[in-house]
Amino acid sequence: RFQEEHRYKKPVAIYWLQSAAVRLTGGDSASSIYRYRLVSVAAASAAVLVLASLGTYMFGVEAGLAAALMLLGIFGLGFEGRVAKTDATLLAATLVVQAALARLYLGARRGEATGRGWWWTFWIAMGVGLLVKGPITPLVTGLTVAGIAIVDKDRAWLRRLRPAAGIALALLIAAPWFVAITA
């Protein structure tokens, strides 16, 4: 609820995360706004670190550092990282999905064993993305997968995504919210 109005328009993750941040820092619902903003600060910081890791994996240390510094220098990230909104958290979740996708795809192309860790990371972050802002993370990821499939005709790497089980996991993560707003 916000000012006595139910807030079903936005998915619930940001509210849950902000409530946890307030509780973990010893506050209550009437606490100073900075406690609510901690989620955005943490998410913006995580996004920079994930991009550094992704860039390093794909192109080397210099590229990873350059990408992270560019993201860090973007005015929008600085702004979104200081407000109690969903965008920094959405960016972090989406970047985690993209990083896991890169590990799965490039791992297959390079003949690397990726294990199940990146699969779990991909689909859990997808579920979190659904809870943060609905279809945005799946849409971005779907476009990425489609782009790769157009460029790379060998689609054997898609088996690493195990989409049936993965979609079920992501929906299982998001299901409590979907059930709550329809009940």
Residues covered by each model-derived region:
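Membrane-integral, polyisoprenol-dependent glycosyltransferases
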Residues: 1-183
